[in-house]
């Protein structure tokens, strides 16, 4: 099985974003969309990023138009929207697919690591969240209904543990 740090998805400019650079970080991965009822979660995601980035949190957003076609077509439009409307400073990567035959390999890995409610692996909607510990282990998955600020306890717990002692 592939490990988390072996992935190198593409950023908005078409350049690799090597997950190897995320070693010893706590990572929150979110599939996002710009025209969704959950889009205001960007505000709380940015708050988390600003609060915890100096302690080792990285948030990585993957735009996806697979759920209700609620995302811009072009990566530049997505990034401009996120920066202008929500002041987003965390990485927003290239638009992907989360499910199906053309799903991004990162999402295949995440879904195989931790299932959703009732054991369902498929991503159900925008703004599902995966928390990855400092060792690259996917430790928890949260639905779109979970607000980002509700993740503070698990983020703090993982940030307070050295890499070799992660759960």
Curated annotation (Swiss-Prot):
Q: What happens when the gene is disrupted?
A: Impairs growth and peroxisome formation in oleic acid medium.
Q: Does the keyword Membrane apply?
A: yes
Specify the enzyme's EC class, one word: oxidoreductase
Up-regulation conditions = By glucose starvation.
Q: How does it sit in the membrane?
A: Peripheral membrane protein
Keyword annotations from UniProtKB, A to Z: Antioxidant, Disulfide bond, Membrane, Mitochondrion, Mitochondrion outer membrane, Oxidoreductase, Peroxidase, Peroxisome, Redox-active center
Q: Which reaction does it catalyse?
A: 2 glutathione + H2O2 = glutathione disulfide + 2 H2O; a hydroperoxide + [thioredoxin]-dithiol = an alcohol + [thioredoxin]-disulfide + H2O
Q: Which InterPro entries match?
A: Glutathione_peroxidase, GPX_AS, GPX_CS, Thioredoxin-like_sf
Alphabetized Pfam families for the sequence: GSHPx
GO CC field: cytosol; mitochondrial outer membrane; peroxisomal matrix
A molecular function (GO) term:
glutathione peroxidase activity
State where the protein is found. Peroxisome matrix; Mitochondrion outer membrane
SUPFAM superfamilies from the UniProt entry: Thioredoxin-like
In which domain of life is the source organism classified?
Eukaryota
Q: Which PANTHER family match?
A: GLUTATHIONE PEROXIDASE (PTHR11592:SF78)
Assembly, per entry: Monomer.
Instruction: Recite the other comments.
Output: The active site is a conserved redox-active cysteine residue, the peroxidatic cysteine (C(P)), which makes the nucleophilic attack on the peroxide substrate. The peroxide oxidizes the C(P)-SH to cysteine sulfenic acid (C(P)-SOH), which then reacts with another cysteine residue, the resolving cysteine (C(R)), to form a disulfide bridge. The disulfide is subsequently reduced by an appropriate electron donor to complete the catalytic cycle. In this atypical 2-Cys peroxiredoxin, C(R) is present in the same subunit to form an intramolecular disulfide.
Q: Which family does it belong to?
A: Belongs to the glutathione peroxidase family.
Q: What is this protein called?
A: Glutathione peroxidase-like peroxiredoxin 1
UniProt gene name: GPX1
């Amino acid at each position: 099985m592939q490990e988390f740090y072996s992935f190198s998805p593409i950023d908005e400019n078409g350049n690799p974003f090597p997950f190897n650079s995320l070693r010893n970080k706590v990572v929150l991965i979110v599939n996002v969309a710009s025209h969704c009822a959950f889009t205001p979660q960007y505000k709380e995601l940015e708050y988390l990023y600003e609060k915890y980035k100096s302690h080792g949190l990285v948030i990585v957003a993957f735009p996806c138009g697979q759920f209700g076609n609620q995302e811009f077509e072009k990566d530049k439009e997505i990034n401009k929207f996120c920066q202008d409307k929500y002041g987003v400073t965390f990485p927003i990567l290239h638009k992907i697919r989360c499910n199906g035959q053309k799903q991004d390999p990162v999402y295949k890995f995440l879904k195989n690591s931790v299932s959703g409610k009732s054991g369902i692996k498929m991503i159900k909607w925008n703004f599902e969240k995966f928390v990855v510990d400092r060792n690259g282990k996917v430790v928890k998955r949260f639905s779109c209904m979970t607000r980002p600020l509700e993740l503070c306890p698990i983020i703090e717990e993982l940030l307070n543990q050295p890499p070799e002692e992660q759960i």
